[in-house]
Regions:
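Non-cysteine beta-strand/loop elements that form the S-adenosyl-L-methionine
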Residues: 70-73, 91-94, 127-145, 177-181, ...
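C-terminal active-site-proximal or functional interface alpha/beta core segments in diverse enzymes
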Residues: 188-270
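A charged N-terminal "starter" segment
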Residues: 1-109, 115-128, 152, 167, ...
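Phosphate/diphosphate-binding glycine-rich loops and adjacent basic-rich segments that engage nucleotide
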Residues: 132-159, 166
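A short small-residue
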Residues: 6-13, 178-182, 216-223
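Active-site-proximal loop/turn and secondary-structure-junction residues that shape catalytic pockets
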Residues: 48-52, 73-74, 94-96, 114-116, ...
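Short acidic, glycine/serine/threonine-rich loops at helix termini
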Residues: 57, 80, 100-102, 122-125, ...
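Active-site glycine- and acidic-residue-rich loops that bind
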Residues: 108-120, 151-163, 185-198, 230, ...
Length: 270
């Protein structure tokens, strides 16, 4: 997108005007999928809280992306944009059981991040497929304000509560199909991310009917010239190898999920 293009668009549509570069979004999406091309099953859930413009959602849908939603309003917007319920993940924080029930009734995958709701939902709906969000207590984001995997974070069930979590799952006989984590935004050190991934793998070993592992996102993009960014290619190389190795140990090809938001869209806006 060149300055002259922006001037022409402003003259055509008037100003102020929001312009998004579809080619940039597409190149970022392809960069991520290429980095993990050695993984048999890869799914991208666009974190729509980054930019929920319906035209952007439709663009990503046509590329093959799915969605990560944090509220029932985002779920409804995703459905409006043409996504099917099975293409949407619901990852709320601090919402009521009633809202989770309402979203689940739509056929959307539920991701639960606290023990109280997990027990209540599992008791009422033991056969409904559920993903569990854990907190690995690893701070991989740029600072504590945008890191959500550290010990004081409100996001996710602490790994120190794993025995309690397992008791709930055993007592309710609920159907756990996925394990999820999200360490934070602006990840610089991929070794820290890989360390958190090992914690996720260890937790996953406790569940025998998993279908996917969700590693969140938080990939840093450059905000200015020569700014540092997450080395997606190196992360793809290392995590793909370890993920494939884990699947072999687990005895099943699981789906690897990422939920990028600003990685896909933050460099595309004008």
């Amino acid at each position: 997108m060149q300055p002259k293009d922006l001037v022409q668009l402003a003259e055509q549509f008037g100003s102020p005007l929001y312009v998004y570069d579809a080619a940039k979004i597409q190149s970022q999406y392809q960069r991520l999928t290429k980095a993990f091309s050695k993984v048999e099953k890869l799914r991208i859930n666009y974190a729509m809280k980054a930019l929920s413009n319906v035209a952007i959602l439709e663009l990503l849908r046509d590329m093959g992306s799915c969605l990560d939603a944090v509220s029932i309003q985002e779920v409804q917007l995703g459905l409006h944009a043409g996504y099917s319920p099975d293409q949407i993940f619901f990852t709320p924080n601090g919402v009521s059981l009633e809202e989770i029930e309402e979203v689940s009734a739509l056929g959307v995958q539920i991701n639960i991040d606290n023990l109280s709701i997990l027990e209540q939902f599992g008791t009422k709906y033991p056969t409904v497929p559920v993903c569990i969000r854990i907190n690995p207590h690893v701070m991989a984001g740029g600072n504590t304000n945008i890191s959500v995997g550290h010990i004081d974070s409100k996001f996710g069930i602490s790994i120190h509560q794993l025995p309690h979590l397992l008791r709930i799952v055993e007592n309710t006989k609920m159907h756990i199909v996925g394990i999820h984590m999200h360490t934070g935004s602006d990840i610089l050190d991929i070794e820290v991310f890989l360390y958190a991934a090992e914690i996720l793998f260890d937790v996953a070993k406790n569940f025998k009917e998993l279908e996917f592992l969700d590693f969140g996102s938080g990939f840093k993009v450059p905000y200015k010239k020569d700014d540092i960014e997450t080395d997606i290619e190196e992360l793809g190389k290392k995590l793909s190898k370890r993920f494939n190795s884990f699947c072999a140990e687990y005895g099943k090809d699981l789906t690897l999920i990422f939920e990028p938001g600003k990685f896909l869209v933050s460099e595309a806006g004008y």
